[in-house]
Amino acid sequence: MKFLIAIKNTKKESKNILEIGCKIAEGFSADLTICYIGKQSKALIEGDVNLARKTLSEWNIHHPGLEVLEWAFNILKEKGFAPNSDFDVDNLVEEKGRIRMVLSKTTNYQIGLVLREGDLLSELNKEVKHSDFDIVIMGSPHRKRMINKISQFLDTSIFFVKNFNPNWNYKILLCVDDSRATKRAVILSTRISKQFDAEITSLTVSKTSLFGKGYRNAHIWAERYLQRIGIPFNSKLVSGNPVEVFVNEAGEDHIIIMGKAKGNEFLKFIWGSKPIHTAQRANCPVLLVN
């Protein structure tokens, strides 16, 4: 698998995003790319870069994102990723619309560092298409509309990291319904559960007291799969407003995992969807599975 971690600075929030991203990637033995997307600089627009002649200080003047990537790289080394690699600007390669650092593969997974410039959503979308990432891990945008846009336009799973505290013992809230991505969400939840040594709560919520065949079948399938894998879990069928139940049940000490919604893409963009509203309102990390 291939994971992308998007960071914007060297602050505590970005460090927490790296913490949880590294831990999850380790559980999947996934290739890991750290991507910084900054404002567009005149130098990159004009192609006025000569990688062989630039010193690190010169690069940092024109591309402050390299300082962020070096900071992130050092954290990766602390976590045991790329232990024998060095941050060396001589290994920078300029490609169309992006700059990446070539790192040797010293473990069973590959580490990458990428610098892009321009609109966040547009550049994220280009990077996802360029490398076909399975999961994008990023901070949760403050604007709800941006969460909607990112969820809709990135054709991959998205992990919004919100209020993550590396010192907490997180549990997993697995939201189960009849959406086509639910089974994949269940499967991913077991891998993440093992990494965090976290118990899973499998939760199916119906707006009425009646649970349709699709909901019941999905709930039963999730129970059977979790039993087969041997993950500690409890299972709930609850009536109520799904988003409110998910958010209240999760609180701040859960990682919510749920499938992306099916249905009309235009209507989802205008009105949102159950997973999008959950990601917007939750006070904890949320993984929307594609």
Residue ranges and their predicted role:
Residues 41-42, 92-93, 144, 167, ...:
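Short secondary-structure capping/turn micro-motifs that flank functional sites
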Residues 61, 65-76, 219:
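N-terminal membrane-insertion helices
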Residues 101-105, 161-168:
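Short boundary motifs at domain starts and secondary-structure transition points
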